[in-house]
Structure formats: C-alpha cells, structure tokens
C-alpha cells in the first residue's frame, strides 16, 4: 500500500507522485464514485510493477480487495500482530464490502477489534474509501454458521448446506428478506463471494 499525491489527470489515467517515482491509477482500477483532483492525497494498492525502457512503471489500484485488507492491517494492531486473522474479503468498490475475521485468542473478539473503540478503527477506513460501507463478520469453520454470519446485518433462522454442491439454502424471517438479499441483490452477492458458497435465500413463509 502506498500514499501519494495526485499530480495530474490525463484522459482517464490518474498520475500519482510517490516521491522518487510516479504511479499510474488506470480507469479499470478507479472507484466509479470517486473524483480524483490534482493535489489530493490518496492511498492505493500496488498491483504490478512493469519494466519499461523509461524505468519501472507502477500500476496501482483503489478497487483491489488487497487495499481493504492492508488498510485493516494498518488500522487494527490485532491483525498486524497476527492475533486476529482476516480470512476473506469481498468488495463492490465504492459501494459496500464484507470482511470475515477470526481470532486465534478466545479472549479477543475479532469483530470488536476491527470496529474499534466507538467504531473509530472501521470509520477511519470508511473515510479513506469515501463512505464505502463495510460489514465485518465472524469467520467460522462450520459453513452453516459462517454463511449465516456473512448475511449480516440480516438475521437468519436456518441454513442447510450441501457440501458436494457447495450450495446453501437459507431461511430468514419475512421482514428480513429484503435486508438479507440487499439492494439489487448486493448483500447476498457479497456474502456468496465472501464465503465462496452459493446462497439461496427464502423467507419463512415462502
């Protein structure tokens, strides 16, 4: 992860000064909801370094899941120290993300550590990503529990899993159905991406 200052915008490419060198933020790695202005200081994730005749060309990203992962490592000492492990990240950049965390120490609440006192740790990351919503869920080796957690903030009644097909059937209370699915299916889509399971959601009366 690097911090730099935007020096110029040429066409759709944003150029960032890293001190001794310059990096390129191409349109494919930009967050659609962000505006990039000359003089702005931003954090980015290094995707690759290309060798060119003019020297190394550094390609950076604001959309890469690795950016979110590194921001949590910088903000949460428990992750940096290895007490809390970040198991999975799913992102729809600029909109919403989900991260799954696990604690190696039963006395440390992994979700609480990431949220921080008065929500300050996660808020710093949300601010850096210009109000991208972040759901922090507890990872579990039991897929049914993990899937139920991944659909947070929705409450789940039951989860049936098929290990062979890596698919699940989730029942939620009627009043929680739209929350579980999310706007334009976003919550369910991110939960499936986070857990790597197919998730079929139905309400209690369906």
Protein language model regions, located:
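RNA-contacting regions in translation and RNA-metabolism proteins
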Residues: 1-206
């Amino acid at each position: 992860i690097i911090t730099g200052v935007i020096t110029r915008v040429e066409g759709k490419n944003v150029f960032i000064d890293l001190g001794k060198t310059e990096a390129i933020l191409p349109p494919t790695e930009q967050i659609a909801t962000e505006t990039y202005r000359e003089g702005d200081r931003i954090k980015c994730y290094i995707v690759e370094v290309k060798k060119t005749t003019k020297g190394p060309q550094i390609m950076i990203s604001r959309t890469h899941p690795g950016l979110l992962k590194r921001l949590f490592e910088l903000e949460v000492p428990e992750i940096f120290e290895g007490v809390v492990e970040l198991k999975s990240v799913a992102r729809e950049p600029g909109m919403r993300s989900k991260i799954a965390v696990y604690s190696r120490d039963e006395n440390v609440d992994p979700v609480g550590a990431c949220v921080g006192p008065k929500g300050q740790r996660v808020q710093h990351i949300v601010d850096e990503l210009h109000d991208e919503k972040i759901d922090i869920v507890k990872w579990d080796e039991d897929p049914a529990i993990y899937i139920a957690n991944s659909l947070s903030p929705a409450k789940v009644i039951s989860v049936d899993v098929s290990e062979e097909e890596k698919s699940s059937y989730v029942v939620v209370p009627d009043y929680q159905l739209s929350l579980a699915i999310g706007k334009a299916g976003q919550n369910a889509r991110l939960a499936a991406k986070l857990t790597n399971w197919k998730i079929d959601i139905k309400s209690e009366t369906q």
